[in-house]
Every structure is written in C-alpha cells, then in structure tokens.
Amino acid sequence: MTETEFLALVEQVLDSVERMADDWAAEQDLDIEANRSGNVLTLVFEDGTHVVINSQAAMQELWLASRSGGFHYRFDGQRWNDTRGGPGFVDALSQVCSAAAGVPLTVRL
C-alpha cells in the first residue's frame, strides 16, 4: 500500500472512532471528549483515562496507547492486526474504552 493509501485509511479509522465517541457520549450519556490533532486522536473519559490513537506512516502502523499499554497494528487488507499477536485493533479499542467508561462499548469500523 502506498503512503497516500495508508494515510487515507487511517483518516477513515480516526473519523469513525471520533464519530463513535460522540455517539457514545450522546446516546449513553457518557462523558467522553474526543480531541483530534492531525493523525492523533485522543479520547478522554470521565475518570481521566486517556486513550490515544495515532498513525506511524513510515511503518504503516496504527498505534493505540492506554493505561493497559501501547499496541501496534498493521492492516492486512481486511482488519488491523496486533503486530505481537494480541487482539485486533477493534477488539482492543472496545476493551480499553469499555474499561474506561465503566460500561460495555463496541467499536465498529
């Protein structure tokens, strides 16, 4: 994948997650703030938890940072896979957001 294709894909992911956070806040009356600066999206939850998603274009990776650690993902044409064999991006983000919000949240891209 070219760098341009990668950046467009990341833009779609960040847009989707940002919209989802706004929807969760409105529909479930949760205090979640989504802050975007370029290719970095930070979700701030009521308890002060920060979840940061950003891209590393040179490595063609999407990174997720939370209290539980930092995770790197590569796109295989269908999904973002953990480079160390852990849960995929969607499952991992669902888990960290659910833990931070205190209610089950499901990420869909």
From Swiss-Prot:
Keyword Iron carried by entry: yes
Biological process terms in GO annotation: iron-sulfur cluster assembly
Gene Ontology cellular-component annotations: cytoplasm
SUPFAM superfamilies (alphabetical): Frataxin/Nqo15-like
UniProt keyword list: Iron, Metal-binding
InterPro entries linked: CyaY (IPR047584), Frataxin/CyaY (IPR002908), Frataxin/CyaY_sf (IPR036524), Frataxin_CS (IPR020895)
GO molecular function: ferric iron binding
Superkingdom assignment: Bacteria
Pfam families: Frataxin_Cyay (PF01491)
Function according to Swiss-Prot or TrEMBL: Involved in iron-sulfur (Fe-S) cluster assembly. May act as a regulator of Fe-S biogenesis.
Family recorded in the similarity comment: Belongs to the frataxin family.
Entries under PANTHER family matching the protein: FRATAXIN, FRATAXIN, MITOCHONDRIAL
Protein name per its UniProtKB record: Iron-sulfur cluster assembly protein CyaY
Protein's organism: Bordetella avium (strain 197N)
Highest classification ranks of the organism: Bacteria, Pseudomonadati, Pseudomonadota, Betaproteobacteria, Burkholderiales
Gene field: cyaY
